């Protein structure tokens, strides 16, 4: 089967998940990937006989001081689309894919270009991501408390992103009731290096900061009493830089995974991918969601509710100390978590592809629910 696979390029979580799925798909199918941002370079390395990777333009999110800057995000995206050739580049890619590949089914990891291609050519779409949980599941009001407006905005955007798909596969470590049809929940997709990692409890914190605009973080970490191995805050490093208890490290996938599997706990944002990996390896996590990013708030609050760590919507010395003091409690909570690799989602994806092939896109969503 010829598969068009769209991957959103904001952040690396979607690309890491897609890499695992693509490695499985190319065993039986020919796949054309369309992807934007840094994710393109990551996935392009995997191109081969049955996998082609094409770069498109995609939106970006601007953050400062651990908060999404809505106006600057708007300006950056208008500039990218109109002044830097983003939309013309995407139109060119559209006709290239139409001429040379002729897909039979489309898979979208929260990516719009591939979805619009499917709509225009009456192709079935399968959604694979973690975001649709906000739209297609019933969330406990306690999880949205204080962020009801952000929840409704996020829900509306996500609902409009890939409407009317043949099936929605949602990757998650928490399981709210499903409220819409054609929707299934599955454990997180994990890269093989994580599945092969053997967790050992060391005496350091792993700190991962995607955005470099959180100037207060280093001073707080110095008060932790633990060695902190930090990735992301100093991106130009070629070798580790030591500042007291803080060890800033250049990014290395192997080094990062080793620090993750041996850490006492993780301090990071509310992004889903690392959170899922930490849960799988039974590593407690202090999740600091980016402000105004409801998906991260939901992830962090759900993590705390499950007993796997803490949510810190504002990171303070007291909250960090509480996290460290409760590490044994979180370790106990995590001890009961288990999943059978990636089998669950991958089997359902193949089943959904075979069922959807040749059926055309659905006319609309389940009319019984908003």
Segments the model singles out, each with a brief description of its role:
Residues 124-185:
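Active-site-proximal region of nucleotide-activated glycan assembly enzymes
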Residues 22, 189-265:
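Donor-nucleotide binding loops and adjacent catalytic segments primarily
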Residues 105-109, 259-298:
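A donor-sugar binding/catalytic signature common to diverse glycosyltransferases
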Residues 241, 250-251, 284-330:
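Nucleotide-sugar donor-binding patch of glycosyltransferase catalytic domains
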Residues 9, 32-85:
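Conserved nucleotide-sugar phosphate-binding/catalytic loop shared by glycosyltransferases and other
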Residues 322-370:
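C-terminal amphipathic helix plus adjacent low-complexity
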Residues 95-111:
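Short N-terminal targeting/anchoring amphipathic segment
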Residues 6-19:
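A short, glycine/small-residue-rich beta-strand->loop->alpha-helix junction that serves as a flexible
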């Amino acid at each position: 089967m010829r598969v068009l696979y769209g991957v959103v390029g904001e952040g690396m979580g979607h690309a890491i998940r897609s890499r695992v799925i693509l490695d499985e798909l190319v065993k039986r199918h020919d796949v054309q990937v369309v992807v934007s941002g840094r994710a393109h370079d990551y996935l392009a390395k995997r191109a081969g006989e049955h996998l082609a990777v094409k770069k498109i333009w995609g939106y970006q999110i601007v953050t400062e001081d651990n908060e999404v800057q809505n106006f600057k995000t708007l300006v950056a995206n208008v500039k990218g689309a109109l002044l830097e050739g983003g939309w013309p580049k995407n139109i060119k890619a559209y006709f290239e894919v139409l001429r040379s590949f002729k897909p039979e089914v489309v898979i979208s990891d929260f990516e719009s270009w591939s979805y619009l291609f499917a709509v225009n050519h009456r192709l079935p779409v399968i959604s694979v991501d973690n975001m649709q949980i906000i739209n297609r599941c019933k969330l406990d009001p306690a999880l949205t408390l204080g962020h009801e407006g952000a929840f409704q905005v996020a829900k509306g955007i996500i609902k409009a992103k890939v409407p009317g798909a043949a099936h929605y596969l949602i990757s998650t470590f928490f399981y709210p009731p499903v409220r819409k049809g054609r929707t299934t929940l599955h454990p997180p997709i994990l890269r093989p290096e994580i599945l092969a990692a053997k967790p050992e409890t060391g005496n350091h914190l792993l700190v991962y900061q995607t955005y470099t605009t959180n100037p207060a973080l280093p001073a707080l970490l110095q008060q932790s009493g633990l060695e902190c191995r930090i990735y992301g805050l100093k991106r130009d490093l070629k070798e580790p830089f030591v500042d007291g208890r803080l060890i800033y490290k250049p990014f290395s996938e192997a080094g990062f995974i080793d620090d993750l599997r041996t850490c006492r706990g993780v301090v990071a944002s509310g992004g889903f991918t690392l959170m899922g990996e930490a849960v799988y390896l039974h590593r407690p996590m202090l999740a600091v969601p980016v402000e105004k990013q409801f998906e991260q708030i939901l992830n962090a609050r759900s993590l705390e509710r499950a007993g796997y760590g803490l949510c810190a919507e504002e990171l303070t010395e007291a909250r960090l100390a509480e996290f460290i003091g409760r590490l044994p409690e979180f370790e106990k909570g995590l001890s009961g978590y288990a999943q059978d690799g990636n089998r669950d989602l991958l089997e359902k994806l193949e089943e959904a592809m075979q069922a959807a092939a040749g059926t055309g896109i659905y006319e609309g969503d389940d009319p019984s629910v908003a």
